[in-house]
């Protein structure tokens, strides 16, 4: 039996309109049990200032970003289900959903799926890795009832 443990931290000045803890739990449960039976993840919802500071400190990028993934790596002799932390910036997610003409809840789900795959070791540095990761993301999003996250909902193609 699989188990996903969520530690949800809301560090946004305004928590109105955020997805529910149940939403985040459902999104994690659509991803993590596919790869390991027991997982623990912290999701921290932040405002742009905190996202910007973390992105600058850990990635050298002087801007806020949608999601940051911080995988936890225990020493090899210690087995823990802790995968790591996802830091998701509310304002960036909301802005991107508008710009990309996507349903807001679907974009939140995509950020959780995308970030979770990073915690599991997936990346998109080169084209082959990106293609594999996007395929997995799209399958998971479809399983959740959402459209392909890489196609705008208003895209005529």
UniProtKB/Swiss-Prot annotation:
InterPro entries: MetalPrtase_cat_dom_sf_prd (IPR023091), YbeY (IPR002036), YbeY_CS (IPR020549). GO terms for cellular component: cytoplasm. Zn(2+) binds at residues 114, 118, 124. GO terms for molecular function: metalloendopeptidase activity; RNA endonuclease activity; zinc ion binding. Its main location: cytoplasm. Its EC number is 3.1.-.-. HAMAP family: Endoribonucl_YbeY (MF_00009). NCBIfam families: rRNA maturation RNase YbeY. Single strand-specific metallo-endoribonuclease involved in late-stage 70S ribosome quality control and in maturation of the 3' terminus of the 16S rRNA. This is Endoribonuclease YbeY. The gene is ybeY.
């Amino acid at each position: 039996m699989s188990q996903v443990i969520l530690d949800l931290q809301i560090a946004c000045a305004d928590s109105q309109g955020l997805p529910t803890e149940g939403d985040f739990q459902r999104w994690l449960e659509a991803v993590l049990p596919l790869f390991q039976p027991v997982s623990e993840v912290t999701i921290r919802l932040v405002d742009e200032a905190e996202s910007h500071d973390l992105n600058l400190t850990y990635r050298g990028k002087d801007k806020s970003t949608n999601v940051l993934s911080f995988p936890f790596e225990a020493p090899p002799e210690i087995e823990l289900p802790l995968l790591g932390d996802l830091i998701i910036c509310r304002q960036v997610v909301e802005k991107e959903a508008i710009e990309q003409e996507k349903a807001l809840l679907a974009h939140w789900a995509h950020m959780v799926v995308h970030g979770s795959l990073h915690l599991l070791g997936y990346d998109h540095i080169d084209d082959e890795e990106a293609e594999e990761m996007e395929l997995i993301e799209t399958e998971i999003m479809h399983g959740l009832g959402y459209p392909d996250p890489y196609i705008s909902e208003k895209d005529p193609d």
